[in-house]
């Protein structure tokens, strides 16, 4: 099994459905960026009961992985979302927030340490829940009218070479997953 280090000492976010779900329902990994200027502000927002938003994991700029919501619960990360015939993707997914100011505040490349953590955490989740590459998506894939994250600087091409998600090469016309 992939070796990863996850910090579970952070106070959990209160923003999740309290009834545990069946692990067989977990079919997706959804990547997000925080879209906030400061990492600390993003963590505070994701753990504040008034914000009504959370994720299962938070990846800091230094690569540290924090647990915000235990995987057995439905975190509130996807909002109004759909993929093919499924609606409310929160029910079927693990949400991963990656610290990045996003398009609103000088969108930057993700750090190498963050990408290493994305890779390790993804491999762990893929193995644990038997998640297929075609179901490793960005927030923008499941909420295209509302969201841009994780954005064009997210290393989909690199990750797809490691069997995490797909890279859509228009020139080669391969690795496409059509929804019809």
Predicted regions and their residues:
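Short coil-to-beta-strand
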Residues: 87-98
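Basic/polar, cationic surfaces and motifs that engage anionic cell-wall
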Residues: 102, 106-180
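Residues immediately flanking
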Residues: 33, 98, 140
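Hydrophobic "anchor" residues on beta-strands that sit immediately upstream
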Residues: 28, 93, 135
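Structured loop/turn residues at beta-strand edges in well-structured enzyme cores
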Residues: 24, 91, 131
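Conserved beta-strand segments that form the floor/walls of ligand-binding pockets within enzyme
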Residues: 58, 95-97, 137
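Conserved, mostly hydrophobic/aromatic
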Residues: 31, 96, 118
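N-terminal catalytic cores of peptidoglycan-degrading enzymes
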Residues: 1-87
């Amino acid at each position: 099994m992939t070796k990863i280090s996850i910090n579970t000492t952070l106070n959990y976010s209160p923003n999740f459905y309290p009834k545990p779900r069946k692990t067989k329902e977990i079919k997706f990994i959804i990547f997000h960026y925080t879209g906030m200027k400061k990492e600390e502000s993003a963590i505070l927002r994701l753990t504040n009961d008034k914000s009504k938003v959370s994720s299962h994991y938070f990846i800091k700029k230094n690569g540290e992985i924090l647990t915000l919501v235990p995987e057995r619960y439905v975190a509130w990360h996807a909002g109004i979302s759909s993929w093919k015939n499924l609606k409310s993707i929160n029910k079927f997914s693990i949400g991963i927030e990656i610290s990045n100011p996003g398009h609103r505040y000088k969108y930057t490349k993700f750090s190498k340490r963050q990408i290493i953590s994305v890779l390790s955490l993804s491999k762990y989740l893929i193995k644990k829940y038997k998640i297929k590459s075609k179901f490793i998506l960005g927030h923008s894939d499941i909420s295209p009218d509302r969201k841009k994250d994780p954005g064009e600087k997210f290393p989909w091409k690199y990750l797809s070479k490691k069997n995490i998600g797909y890279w859509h090469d228009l020139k080669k016309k391969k690795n496409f997953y059509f929804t019809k």
